From Swiss-Prot:
InterPro entries: Kelch-typ_b-propeller, NANM, NanM_proteobact
NCBIfam families named among the record's database cross-references: muta_rot_YjhT (TIGR03547)
Entry protein name: Kelch domain-containing protein VC_1773
UniProt source species: Vibrio cholerae serotype O1 (strain ATCC 39315 / El Tor Inaba N16961)
Keyword Repeat: yes
Source taxon at top rank: Bacteria
Protein's UniProt keywords contain Repeat: yes
Kelch repeat residue numbers: 72-125, 163-210, 288-331, 333-355
Keywords on record: Kelch repeat, Repeat
């Protein structure tokens, strides 16, 4: 089965660590590195290119959890600078974008926990499910302390604080272990299960029928998970979960991925790009909790396909890797919108992917 890529019109500005999705025949992308900007591309009129949609009304943010549900785009949490702060904190608000009227609305209820870096998906047109997310207090306290240090005047103190924070065991970061459910019609939040695996941030997430597949992500800052997990939901509750076939089964030097693009085409899960540190898994096995210390972040260009039984490295996107962009798919095509390259640049390139 061949994979074909098609270049789409470029975004007006680069978008990394942002949000977006596909609603009907329109693609949306924005926030993250583009601030409060939000853009729309009509797939039936691509010659017109991306146009400005309604600006996001809340605090500009990176790495929010986002998904399309009931033909609306929902955005939760993320990290942004509130009030008079000089550093980002975990945001506890949510917003919904109504594409029919091109309008954002803030959700009335405060989030039950921080969802910075969390993964979420629509389990049905009336329910959104959440996995993972940074702990608000842990994140905020660390950013508060490190913001007090002038790295040019006190580089050793800065490095020491980073080292102490990164050298903690996985459980010390207290990432969200609960599987949360959100009902948009009444903004009701509930815990529908506890994740039996180590919680992740920056995972790929795909929903099909009553099964949610969670693909890798981080287990702590700088260290990736090597697992693909499946979660079966029944009557709104987490019924069963297990480990699935993983990329490391066919690629023994695989380091795991975070910030990868993901989608579903013809009942196959597609994973593209992502970032990781070469040597981090070996360092962690040897007892180095600061597993990515001194290592260079690598940006992948691999295209992986999962048929539910095994993974296959089908091809490469190009010579350069990419991560931290917006993923969207509709079962027939997958879209790779923006992202970040190995130089840290926010990308404007957009692609569609088809399987022939």
């Amino acid at each position: 089965m061949a994979i074909s890529f098609q270049l789409l019109p470029e975004l007006p500005v680069g978008v990394k660590h942002g949000v977006g999705g596909i609603i009907g025949q329109k693609l949306y992308a924005g926030l993250g590195s583009s601030g409060n900007a939000f853009f729309v591309l009509d797939l039936k009129d691509m010659n017109s290119g991306w146009k400005s949609a309604a600006d996001f009304p809340g605090i500009a943010r990176n790495d929010a959890a986002y998904t399309v549900c009931g033909n609306k785009l929902y955005v939760f949490s993320g990290a942004g600078i509130e009030g008079n702060n000089s550093f980002p904190t975990v945001l506890m608000d949510g917003y919904v974008f109504d594409s029919q009227i091109n309008q954002w609305k803030r959700l009335e209820r405060t989030l039950p926990t921080g969802f910075l870096g969390a993964s979420c998906c629509s389990l049905s047109p009336t329910e959104i499910i959440f996995f993972g997310g940074y702990d608000k207090d842990t994140f905020n306290n660390f950013l508060s302390e490190i913001s007090k240090i002038d790295v040019t005047k006190e580089p050793n103190k800065y490095k020491e604080l980073i080292t102490i924070f990164m050298s903690q065991p996985i459980d010390n970061y207290n990432w969200n272990k609960n599987v949360w459910s959100f009902t948009p019609c009444n903004e009701h939040w509930s815990v529908v299960g506890e994740n039996p695996f180590k919680p992740n941030c920056g995972s790929g997430i795909i929903h099909k029928n009553n099964v949610v597949t969670l693909i890798e992500g981080e287990v702590k800052p700088g260290l990736r998970s090597l697992e693909t997990k499946r979660y079966l939901f029944k009557e709104g509750k987490l019924e069963y979960s297990d480990s699935s076939a993983s990329i490391i089964d066919i690629c023994k030097n695989h380091e795991g991925l975070a910030g990868h693009f993901f989608g579903e085409i013809d009942n196959k899960i597609i994973v593209i790009g992502g970032a990781y540190f070469i040597g981090s898994q070996d360092a962690f096995i040897k007892g180095n909790l600061y597993a990515h210390n001194g290592l260079i972040k690598h940006f992948s260009s691999n295209v992986w396909i999962f048929d539910g039984k095994s993974w296959e490295n089908k091809c490469q996107l190009d010579a350069a890797g990419i991560a931290y962009g917006v993923s969207a798919s509709n079962g027939k095509a997958m879209y790779v919108l923006g992202g970040e390259n190995s130089n840290g640049d926010a990308m404007t390139r957009c692609l569609s992917l088809l399987m022939d």
